[in-house]
Amino acid sequence: MGSKNRYFPLAINLFLHYTCIVIKRTGYADLPLHVGTVPKWLADRMMELGTLIVESLIINYGKKEVLQRLSDPLWFQSLGAVLGMDWHSSGITTSVMYALKRGINRRAKEFGLCVCGGRGKYSRKTPEELLFLADATGLDGENLVRTSKLTAKVDSTAIQDGFQLYQHNFILSDEGDWAVVQQGMNGQTQTARRYHWCSESVKNFCEDPHTAVIGENRGKILNLTAKEASPTKNAIIQISKENPDKIIKECKQIIDTNSFSKSSLKNATELELFENPESEKTKILLYNDRNLTMPSHHEVRAEDVDLKRLGAVLATAYSTPTDNFEDLLLTQGLGPRTLQTLTLVSEVIYGTPSRFYDPARFSFANGGKDGHPFPVPLKVYDNAIQVLQDSIEKSKLGYKDKSECIKRLHTTALEIEKNCSPEADFEKTLAFERANSDAWGGKTV
């Protein structure tokens, strides 16, 4: 009983039927906990641009790609930044998912996608919404509801990391593929952790089931979904079958002899206790490839951005020969600053996973509602929406010149990165943005 007793308090809560469903958590993100609301002038634009990005992904790659991208913490954070939301706070999760739910659901039949759930009371409506969708599509509603509840149960119970879930979004395709984006908060540390799940990328529900997670370094955490924790899970299940009086007696002995000490935990090999390593290059902490921890500071700093990549974006917008993007530049009112935004939007659509390790860079598309790195340039934002919308509509009719131009913005930036040394002067770039903020319709909350 010795090694089992230390885990007794978890026994009841962890009696879950893990292996019945094949799903995986793709990762997590840790974020500073912020309060406040997104103003209507930004929320509506986030909905428009976010929906257009989703539509572009569906046209180019299919709806499964949308689910896979939403299950990537780094891509999700970059999407929120390019939409003009505060680049690193907990609010990016709520605002992006609200924008996508508004935009995608009104075109659910066309897209073959629907967003369920939300924050607080809306998260509790997820089962009802899933059953409704199941009736409309012929999918197994009870299985979907069970999956939704299990993903929430794992992140709220099986992983003892101190975060209480308050948001749960279940994104479902009409073919039964899905992604989950949910978030918990820790009031004591004023941090939030966003968890990502995806049905496509998993082998076993209870062994490393997450595709990724985003959050602040909280030191040691208990992860009972890792493969290495199998002996621990088995011990817990066995403990749950023992006589309660016997277990209580043994627990008392453990407490009296101080067996449940920090030193014994440090040497325990049966459960995964790990310390999140700090990055030497940037204050954004990256580990397990797609997991992300955002820094506590509010302002965007040079260390948060890949300056070479930012330099390539600026060079694409301001220094590339105009005949490269002639079809775009014929759009009335479109100039280099809108090209800058469109280049970053293009990267969100066409970029590979390795492009999203510095989400802060994408805030140089449309700024941030709190003025970081600069106020949201509404005129530029609206121009970018119009150009992207026009390119999509024309591509549906067979006229792909504009959509090809938008794709070429990203490929041009890649070529500049490869063949030049376009490192941006961070302070001068910020000064330029702020000096022109009024002319571009800059606005903050």
Residue ranges and their predicted role:
Residues 54-59, 290-293, 321-322, 362-368:
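Short acidic (Asp/Glu) and glycine-rich catalytic loops that position anionic groups and cofactors
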Residues 373-377, 395-445:
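Low-complexity, acidic/Ser/Thr- and charged residue-rich accessory regions of DNA metabolism proteins
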Residues 296-325:
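Helix-hairpin-helix/helix-loop-helix acidic hairpins
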Residues 88, 260, 323, 340, ...:
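Intrinsically disordered or highly flexible coil/loop and linker segments, enriched in small
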Residues 14-292, 433-445:
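Structure-specific DNA junction-binding interface
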Residues 1-21:
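N-terminal amphipathic/basic-hydrophobic helices that include classical n-h-c signal peptides
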Residues 336, 340-396:
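Phosphate-backbone recognition surface of nucleic-acid-processing proteins
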Residues 303-309, 325-344:
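Helix-hairpin-helix
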